[in-house]
Amino acid sequence: MTNIRKTHPLMEIVNNAFIDLPTPSNISSWWNFGSLLGICLILRILTGLFLAMHYTADTATAFSSVTHICRDVNYGWIIRYMHANGASMFSICLFMHVGRGLYYGSYTFLETWNIGVILLFATMATAFMGYVLPWGQMSFWGATVITNLLSAIPYIGTNLVEWIWGGFSVDKATLTRFFAFHFSSPFIIAALAMVHLLFLHETGSNNPTGSLSDMDKIPFHPYYTIKDILGALLLILTLMLLVLFAPDLLGDPDNYTPANPLNTPPHIKPEWYFLFAYAILRSIPNKLGGVLALVLSILILVLMPLLHTSKQRSMMFRPISQCLFWILVADLLTLTWIGGEPVEHPYIIIGQLASITYFTLILVLMPIASTIENNLLKW
């Protein structure tokens, strides 16, 4: 008798993706973040669905509907905070996942990598639109400032901004469309994630050494299912610690004040996971230049396969590149810190230096280091 999981059309897909999938025997915990992102996405779609049942996308009632969810709905507070803090967990997993891809040279899987970059953009757009929905001060002014950046585009900029706003300022039309897009985009992200996985399974997973592992593979289940379950438990534990003990730790106090178009907060800033890009944006005095730098700070990931000059795929045996990679991580942490500080001395110059360092490391120093390491191999 043949096994149903290998013959049934639907079960076969699941079997080939999660059970009998040939997986390198030496992949480390850095390979856990893909499954953790999947768990984050499912968790956030479910909590978002329950929030949408009680939320009203109207400027007059949006803020009070969020208050109503927290105060009157059964377990509404935990659903709301799991959704909000889930965004932070999602972002941490995303950064770790991308960082692992950079470190171990996973960007040589071109289709998988490029779809991953599209997924990153889609997730950032979704998170931004979600931040606008509670209609607090930072929601309103964040939406105003970030959408206004599009006005820097020559010729069509102003028309484009007014088209997105649905009027001459951020108002009811903007909130309604942001809710519509925020509700639908996670399903697009889920579909893209499926395509991401499809292309990954065409080539098979990379491994820490970056070498071919066809001769030494093991089935995904039970070895990596148990490993992923451990990762999932740690993720949920961290999330619940955040939700139950410090739910507002990563939020902005200004968002507990209803949106007021007549009163600008002293310091407008996005959520913490956008601060690195926001710091790069602010470090360039010219508006269009800042917007281009902001987009390029993420789009630069697409160039990684072209900038790869090393004969080795992974950084595991490349000490100079390793050193530069960790300097890049420190630089991103510096940018995150600067993005949350006011625009004054010495933060301006630190932000500008960190921004220059970011692009120089990726575009110049890392390819040079790889070439030096290639020559060292000849010794």
Curated annotation (Swiss-Prot):
Keyword DNA repair: no
Cofactor note: Binds 2 heme b groups non-covalently.
Record's subcellular location: Mitochondrion inner membrane
Residues holding heme b b562: H83, H182
Organismal lineage: Eukaryota, Metazoa, Chordata, Craniata, Vertebrata
Residues annotated as transmembrane: 33-53, 77-98, 113-133, 178-198, 226-246, 288-308, 320-340, 347-367
MF term (GO), any: metal ion binding
Protein name as annotated: Cytochrome b
CDD domains found in the cross-reference section: cytochrome_b_C, Cytochrome_b_N
Family: Belongs to the cytochrome b family.
Chain residues that bind heme b b566: H97, H196
Biological-process GO terms, alphabetical: mitochondrial electron transport, ubiquinol to cytochrome c
Annotated Pfam families: Cytochrom_B_C, Cytochrome_B
Extra facts: Heme 1 (or BL or b562) is low-potential and absorbs at about 562 nm, and heme 2 (or BH or b566) is high-potential and absorbs at about 566 nm.
Gene name as annotated: MT-CYB
